[in-house]
Amino acid sequence: MTQCASRRKSTPNRAILGAFASARGTRWVATIAGLIGFVLSVATPLLPVVQTTAMLDWPQRGQLGSVTAPLISLTPVDFTATVPCDVVRAMPPAGGVVLGTAPKQGKDANLQALFVVVSAQRVDVTDRNVVILSVPREQVTSPQCQRIEVTSTHAGTFANFVGLKDPSGAPLRSGFPDPNLRPQIVGVFTDLTGPAPPGLAVSATIDTRFSTRPTTLKLLAIIGAIVATVVALIALWRLDQLDGRGSIAQLLLRPFRPASSPGGMRRLIPASWRTFTLTDAVVIFGFLLWHVIGANSSDDGYILGMARVADHAGYMSNYFRWFGSPEDPFGWYYNLLALMTHVSDASLWMRLPDLAAGLVCWLLLSREVLPRLGPAVEASKPAYWAAAMVLLTAWMPFNNGLRPEGIIALGSLVTYVLIERSMRYSRLTPAALAVVTAAFTLGVQPTGLIAVAALVAGGRPMLRILVRRHRLVGTLPLVSPMLAAGTVILTVVFADQTLSTVLEATRVRAKIGPSQAWYTENLRYYYLILPTVDGSLSRRFGFLITALCLFTAVFIMLRRKRIPSVARGPAWRLMGVIFGTMFFLMFTPTKWVHHFGLFAAVGAAMAALTTVLVSPSVLRWSRNRMAFLAALFFLLALCWATTNGWWYVSSYGVPFNSAMPKIDGITVSTIFFALFAIAAGYAAWLHFAPRGAGEGRLIRALTTAPVPIVAGFMAAVFVASMVAGIVRQYPTYSNGWSNVRAFVGGCGLADDVLVEPDTNAGFMKPLDGDSGSWGPLGPLGGVNPVGFTPNGVPEHTVAEAIVMKPNQPGTDYDWDAPTKLTSPGINGSTVPLPYGLDPARVPLAGTYTTGAQQQSTLVSAWYLLPKPDDGHPLVVVTAAGKIAGNSVLHGYTPGQTVVLEYAMPGPGALVPAGRMVPDDLYGEQPKAWRNLRFARAKMPADAVAVRVVAEDLSLTPEDWIAVTPPRVPDLRSLQEYVGSTQPVLLDWAVGLAFPCQQPMLHANGIAEIPKFRITPDYSAKKLDTDTWEDGTNGGLLGITDLLLRAHVMATYLSRDWARDWGSLRKFDTLVDAPPAQLELGTATRSGLWSPGKIRIGP
């Protein structure tokens, strides 16, 4: 019997060995194709590309005159200028600017640009506040002087006055060998006019190193690498089949049988994938509902801006920072989004990849991952509900936008599934596909290391499979396809870039930052605990539930060496993926909280596993289950000890979006902490009670499956928050309502932001009843103003901001404008007015004084109130100072009194009928000019007149106020006013909320000049976008600050008057100059060619 059994067992083994021996051709194909794919993939970064070259030459068209050419890299590769001395001789006695790379009156122009300037006594060549050479004008106008030569390259900046000698008799030249002296260029600007004289020339080589496309050779290599890799993987699959065992992968690769044939579709689709449960319906509905009403992620505007600009630029530039360098080597996902912008820029469309990723994650979890964790998990309905609810709650705060964490979560899950499939069937093809998936996941973003963690977690079993197979077919036929699979991503990453350009882009990002060391990883968890949007209720729960389930599972698995019906190998590998990811995240350059979205899928699987591990069938002692319930209550207390905040416009109308949630004055966190204390105390009692105590029906119900209940509760809270926001905001802007309107062509926030194009047009006419009694301030001051004067405003009072020294980037022109008017205004005021108000038409009254303080009062004349209509919903008073008012962010802000009193017609005279406290967005910034808003809807329809009543009863010098007359502004939507064709600098935070506005583009190294700038709310502008887009960091504000003047416009959020939605700024040009015409060409560059380092130094 033993010999017969041994003979039957050895027969198939000999057959398998014979099959492997006869597969010589397949082995050679796998080896050669794999090596070819590997070599071609690795060679791709080194192969040549075709660069689009661009030169800026001046003068243009044979005429002298300024031209604009703002470089996206800010500085050129090199710059040369030649100025004949005859040009200096022909200049007027006062001199002027011969040439400059920026307007002389631009912000910090001397600090950034190069100038050749002639004064009455000298000729100066200056560069970035450094005097390169200064020569007396009389020497330059002498016959000996021939020309002035200026060069600025990586070798330094030098000036040479050809024909002149220094005191030692040497040629008169000077300079500094500093590559950081290369000037910023936004054009060529001059005071010269007329035909261009012979010999006057400026030439700048624009840095277009990133504007490349593959050569034919490189394109063939990319195609060859991809084809060879596919062939190698097919050959590896063929080698896998030689063991004579079937698999799902084998079934899928067989020729399809007709679906109508018996069992055709059933053989094509596994049984587990053909079911549809209530859990599936809830998850799918949850994802679809959240896609419409849910909050977006923090960087959606940033990523959409890059995607919208990429097609025109010719590459995926990091548009807002880092000198326009590309996102490579982590950017292929953004290129997918760039392709999607050809269809639409609407939020619902652009966020489809994350929606699809979430749905696929659930299908993989429910059909592949949970069954792999063992029969106990597969058979547990609470486990499936736990996975579903945790997936939703982890996805909602992190992965409902354009950020790539959702794609990475899917990539990591696919990698894990393929690794498990490889082990289940002892096949290497799934492992090779897992390597491909991990490589492409890592190519999305550095945090794609989570997929690498999945490979590492399954590395040992895969190595055992490799060793077993190598004895049969050799090493190279197995290793070569793996090498090709792991490196084929290079053909995508370096498709249109080279090794040199990607290294330079990486250097720029690392040098400028943020680029934090591995030992600062604690910052990520610190930000999560702060009471900010990054540490909001939803974000805390999305990660902390995963962490709690992870450590609980580790503790139980270590205590219980064997748990019936739980697969230890897959379970430990799942935990290894999460622990490995936490470790690898230490080495990512940024420490943002939104990276926790990576854990959404594996966290859901961990929640399912933990649900089984803490169930009564595993934890039989109620003490342990109650301890876990107490831990859940503590987690909820920690999660609720913050705001219910969501990013930017997603928070509009959401309850408690800027405060800790409360019920009847008691914080929800306190309630959950009390429940934690009760549960922990009961668990402690159970520890000392007899072992069978505490097994009542209530305790068993509470502790059987708490994870899906808690996660389901939190999912309901998130959805309810968004629904409440929509209801409270309707019919004005909310995230969900905007998405609904997108189906009929809505333009997001641009439809609801109202712009006042002409602030001088809406002033009301004062009634003449008391005109003979008006004081020196006219109708604004009324009959007897006390303490108000035409100049009662301190210097440097600007619109919607507080002046800080030194000035921040992105500030308005009024920060640097003269603080006094040269001609007094209509009532003698010399104070500049904001928002384009004309002092010749608009009076001013204020209480600020540096002398003795007094209590001040003002009651203006009555102003005729137009009849109400939908086009004029507001009465506005432009004011400054510490004023009592209401705002969405701060509620009621105490201060001095500025109210609007309205009147009804009476017998022979107007009858005051009530007063209105203003909606004041900037009450916490008392020095700022702003528009106080009084909604017409809150006034009686038969009110016929209004007047301003102002009282400054404080004797503190800082408690001053200033007012202008009331007006009824004529408003237009931002979409109507700005439109969809004018170039706009859309700050990175606002891009997704304004999908119809045209972002300023760039191509061939030159940026488009914007007409407007749209910013987020005051705090976000000051702390986030102004600093991030600073020219010092290679941002777009380096262009606009130097070339343009910004003026904030009066804007309002429709029917949400007390909300600071952001701002619209209009740009005025400093110099009326046309765009420069560039000399374009092409050049073939090797993968190692570099024009030198981008200037990022001070």
From Swiss-Prot:
Q: Which InterPro entries match?
A: Arabino_trans_C (IPR032731), Arabino_trans_C_2 (IPR042486), Arabino_trans_central (IPR007680), Arabino_trans_N (IPR040920), EmbABC_dom1 (IPR027451)
**Root EC class:** transferase
Q: Where are the transmembrane segments?
A: 28-50, 217-239, 271-293, 402-419, 434-456, 472-494, 541-558, 570-587, 597-619, 626-648, 663-685, 698-720
Give the membrane topology: Multi-pass membrane protein
Gene Ontology annotations of biological process type = Actinobacterium-type cell wall biogenesis; cell wall organization; response to antibiotic
Q: Where in the cell is it found?
A: Cell membrane
- Record note on what altering residue 297 to A does: Resistance to EMB
List the induction conditions: Positively regulated by the transcriptional regulatory protein EmbR.
Substitution effect: residue 330 to V: Resistance to EMB
Please state the Enzyme Commission number of this protein: 2.4.2.-
Task: Look up the further comments and give them.
Answer: This is one of the targets of the anti-tuberculosis drug ethambutol [(S,S')-2,2'-(ethylenediimino)di-1-butanol; EMB]. EMB is a first-line drug used to treat tuberculosis. EMB inhibits the transfer of arabinogalactan into the cell wall.
Which family is it part of? Answer: Belongs to the emb family.
Name recorded for this polypeptide: Probable arabinosyltransferase B
Organism, per UniProt?
Answer: Mycobacterium tuberculosis (strain ATCC 25618 / H37Rv)
